[in-house]
Amino acid sequence: MVRSLLPLSWRRCASDSSNSSTNDDIIVDYDGPDLPLPEYPNRPNEPLGMRKQRLLYQSRKRGMLENDLLLSTFAHKYLKDFDEDETAIYDELINGVSNDWDIYYWATGVKPTPPQYETDIMELLKQHVKNTEKVARFRQPELTYYL
């Protein structure tokens, strides 16, 4: 039996399988114009070292190779020196945005960065993406722990 935890505004329909006498197969369809995205959970009591560890890992596992390379090399180079506020801004940047392509387009200058993400950290990321030092970035750096 499938139990839905979705809001009531979602429409649930049982599959039309003639072989099944139960409603085990559920198709979920959203009626609204935009799919609501869950908010990223705030972690107010997370120690700074653990937060940096999490962000270092999350910078490596973005779901698209372009951001994996850009963000993992960025985090490897700068994250260890971020204070608590800068770390929170970076956390919001990589986890508050629902689409990794947005981060990529903003960092590469293809699209303008929205005002809420136009921060010193974003500017640092944009400079990192320009790669004025001509560093070869063909693979992610080794994991480094900050605890």
Swiss-Prot record:
Principal location listed in the UniProt entry: mitochondrion
Superkingdom, taxonomy of origin: Eukaryota
Bilayer-spanning residue ranges: none
A cellular-component GO term for this protein: mitochondrion
Key words of the record: Chaperone, Mitochondrion
Matches recorded under Pfam families: Sdh5 (PF03937)
BP GO terms, sorted: copper ion homeostasis; mitochondrial electron transport, succinate to ubiquinone; mitochondrial respiratory chain complex II assembly; protein-FAD linkage; tricarboxylic acid cycle
Protein localization: Mitochondrion matrix
Gene3D superfamilies: Flavinator of succinate dehydrogenase (1.10.150.250)
Record's miscellaneous remark: This protein may be expected to contain an N-terminal transit peptide but none has been predicted.
Similarity-based family: Belongs to the SDHAF2 family.
PANTHER family in UniProt: PROTEIN EMI5 HOMOLOG, MITOCHONDRIAL, SUCCINATE DEHYDROGENASE ASSEMBLY FACTOR 2, MITOCHONDRIAL
Subunit composition and interactions: Interacts with the flavoprotein subunit within the SDH catalytic dimer.
Function: Plays an essential role in the assembly of succinate dehydrogenase (SDH), an enzyme complex (also referred to as respiratory complex II) that is a component of both the tricarboxylic acid (TCA) cycle and the mitochondrial electron transport chain, and which couples the oxidation of succinate to fumarate with the reduction of ubiquinone (coenzyme Q) to ubiquinol. Required for flavinylation (covalent attachment of FAD) of the flavoprotein subunit of the SDH catalytic dimer.
Protein name, per record: Succinate dehydrogenase assembly factor 2, mitochondrial
